[in-house]
C-alpha cells in the first residue's frame, strides 16, 4: 500500500538511542543550539521535564540514559510536531520520568504511534492498538489490555471452530 502524508502533518521521531543529542552541550546549551531558546526559558522547559537548579548546566554526555531520554522527549515536544513516532520511549526511565511522559502524551493534541514493550505504559496512553502479523495490519479500538482480551477471545473461537471441524 501507499501512505500519503498531509501537507500540515509535521512528523517527530523519538529514537531509543537518542542520536539527536549533542554530548558536549549542556542541557541549556542544547535547547539554545537547536531552538534558539535563552537560559531563562530553557530552565522553565527543563523544569517541566524534572531538571532543576544547576542540573541544567550538566553536559549531556554525563547524563544517565533516563536523563537523556527525558531531554530527547523535551526536544521532540519543542519541534512542534503533530505526529509523533516513539521508539521505546520509556526505556531507562524511572517512575517519575515515565509518569511525566505519560502525562505529556495524554495532553498531546496530535497523533502518536508508539512501539513499546512496556504494557503498563501502553495501557495508560493508547486508545487504539495495531497488530502487524503475517503481512496484515489489524486495528483494535482500545488500549493494550483491550487488545489482549480481544486476542484471547479470537484464539478461543478459532480453537473451538477447529475442534468442531475435527
Question: Could you tell me what each predicted segment is?
Answer:
Residues 1-166:
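ABC ATP-binding cassette signature C-motif
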Amino acid at each position: 500500500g501507499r501512505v500519503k502524508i498531509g501537507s500540515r502533518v509535521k512528523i517527530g521521531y523519538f529514537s531509543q538511542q537518542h542520536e539527536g543529542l549533542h554530548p558536549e552541550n549542556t542541557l541549556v546549551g542544547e535547547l539554545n543550539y537547536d531552538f534558539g531558546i535563552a537560559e531563562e526559558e530553557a530552565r522553565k522547559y527543563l523544569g517541566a521535564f524534572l531538571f532543576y537548579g544547576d542540573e541544567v548546566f550538566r553536559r549531556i554526555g554525563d547524563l544517565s540514559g533516563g536523563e537523556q531520554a527525558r531531554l530527547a522527549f523535551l526536544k521532540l515536544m519543542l519541534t512542534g510536531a503533530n505526529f509523533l513516532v516513539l521508539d521505546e520511549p520509556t526505556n531507562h526511565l524511572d517512575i517519575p520520568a515515565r509518569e511525566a511522559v505519560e502525562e505529556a502524551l495524554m495532553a498531546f493534541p496530535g497523533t502518536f504511534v508508539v512501539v513499546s514493550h512496556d504494557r503498563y505504559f501502553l495501557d495508560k496512553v493508547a486508545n487504539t492498538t495495531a497488530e502487524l502479523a503475517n503481512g496484515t495490519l489489524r486495528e483494535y479500538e482500545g488500549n493494550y489490555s483491550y487488545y489482549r482480551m480481544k486476542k484471547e477471545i479470537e484464539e478461543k473461537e478459532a480453537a473451538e471452530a477447529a475442534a468442531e471441524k475435527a
